[in-house]
């Protein structure tokens, strides 16, 4: 089972709100997911990003592939840097 970390769209029309979820790559965008890792609200002037770092690092270490947008969010929060440092220190 290929696992991805991606955005699940919530909110109403023209007012998007996203949950960052871990899901099977074959499931639909807003379909079934395994676990919620955080949230992303692009509507606010500085976009609000809340991520549970421990869960994100756990899933990255287990082989989950982040989508392009989630990769950008993780790198802006410093999570990818921590992941690469932990991976290279082994």
Curated annotation (Swiss-Prot):
**What superkingdom does the record give?**
Bacteria
Work out whether the entry's keyword set contains Nucleotide-binding: no
GO MF annotations, alphabetized: structural constituent of ribosome
Q: Which GO terms describe its biological process?
A: translation
Question: Would you name any one GO CC term?
Answer: cytoplasm
Annotated disulfide bonds: none
Q: Which UniProt keywords apply?
A: Ribonucleoprotein, Ribosomal protein
Q: Which Pfam families is this protein grouped with?
A: Ribosomal_S16
Q: Which family does it belong to?
A: Belongs to the bacterial ribosomal protein bS16 family.
By its UniProt entry, which HAMAP family does this protein fall under?
A: Ribosomal_bS16
- Protein name in UniProt: Small ribosomal subunit protein bS16
What is the organism of origin for this protein?
Answer: Bacillus pumilus (strain SAFR-032)
UniProt lists the gene as: rpsP
């Amino acid at each position: 089972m290929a696992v991805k970390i991606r955005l699940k769209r919530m909110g109403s029309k023209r007012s998007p709100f996203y949950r960052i979820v871990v899901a099977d790559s074959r499931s639909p965008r807003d379909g079934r997911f395994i676990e919620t890792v955080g949230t992303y609200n692009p509507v606010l002037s500085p976009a609000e990003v809340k991520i549970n770092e421990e869960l994100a690092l756990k899933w990255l270490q287990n082989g989950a592939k982040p989508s392009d947008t989630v990769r950008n969010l993780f790198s802006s929060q410093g999570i990818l840097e921590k992941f690469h440092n932990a991976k290279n220190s082994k």
